[in-house]
Amino acid sequence: MELEKHTHLGKATEYPEEYSPSWLTPIPRAKSRETLGLSGKPDFVGEDLWNGYELSWLNSKGKPEVALGVFRIRCDSLNIIESKSFKLYLNSFNQSRFTSREEVEALMRKDLSAAAQGEVSVTLLSVTDWRDEPSFWRDAENLDVLDIDVDVYTPDASLLPDPVGDDVVEETLSSDLLKSNCPVTGQPDWATLYIHYRGKPLEKAALLKYIVSMRSHQDFHEHCVESVYLTLMQRYQPEKLAVYARYTRRGGLDINPLRSNYPLAADNFKLPRQ
């Protein structure tokens, strides 16, 4: 699949005036997963949590309504949804009339599930309904205070040393230094990366260097998280592992992929850059 031909990315686009699900562009997960050595159903679980901040439609009398959208796409769906197409799809509601928020919610659930070829949860919140969520991720130890020398800016698992000893720890780590790039436009994507694990201790300076090594990598948010998850799982085989990235907002959307080897929902908390 040639992404440049089949997506809206990098192209001038007229914004829609009428609701249509045809704006949604699905991209098979399998294509990027092949580059990670994955075929068939992956061993991890998780979801892609999207927040939509620019969402509006007209009620039956023509008065605008606004909402915040929370969309959860399971990682075992066949497709991701390309982000600009998601934005255009949401914009297509702007001048269309609907009888209720519940009608819009049900329609989005149907359209997004069809595009993703998997279950999608949709929750529309009024501006006054939204509340920040508590989360254990907020207590993560931030690695960015470490003073490291860096000269590798493409993903390099060899930066991670082999595990040493038999000690077992359980801890949550984070870094605000994750940067990856859109595979079509090259536009930078910025995120805070979280890692929770139980297993042999990770060498923290080396882990930070590995995170920084993603800096020139080109891939979608979802697959960057899967790459980090698989690298850590294959190298250290921890008993528990969860990798969660909260990306900064673009086009009224932020994308927050979570991958783990145990059941875990993506907490929807806000960071200063979101």
Swiss-Prot record:
- List localization entries: Cytoplasm
A GO molecular function term, named singly, is: preQ1 synthase activity
The EC number on file is 1.7.1.13
SUPFAM superfamilies (UniProt xref): Tetrahydrobiopterin biosynthesis enzymes-like
Q: Name one Pfam family in it.
A: QueF
Q: Which GO terms describe its biological process?
A: queuosine biosynthetic process; tRNA modification
Which residues of the sequence carry a binding annotation for NADPH? 83-84, 250-251
Give the binding site residues for substrate: 81-83, 221-222
Record's catalysed reaction(s): 7-aminomethyl-7-carbaguanine + 2 NADP(+) = 7-cyano-7-deazaguanine + 2 NADPH + 3 H(+)
Q: Where is the active site?
A: 182 (thioimide intermediate), 189 (proton donor)
Q: Which portions of this protein are annotated as coiled-coil regions?
A: none
Pathway(s) annotated for this protein in UniProt: tRNA modification; tRNA-queuosine biosynthesis
Mind listing the UniProt keywords for this protein, alphabetically?
A: Cytoplasm, NADP, Oxidoreductase, Queuosine biosynthesis
Q: Among the entry's GO cellular component annotations, what is one?
A: cytoplasm
Q: What does this protein do?
A: Catalyzes the NADPH-dependent reduction of 7-cyano-7-deazaguanine (preQ0) to 7-aminomethyl-7-deazaguanine (preQ1).
Q: Which family does it belong to?
A: Belongs to the GTP cyclohydrolase I family. QueF type 2 subfamily.
Question: Which protein are we looking at?
Answer: NADPH-dependent 7-cyano-7-deazaguanine reductase
| Protein's organism | Hahella chejuensis (strain KCTC 2396)
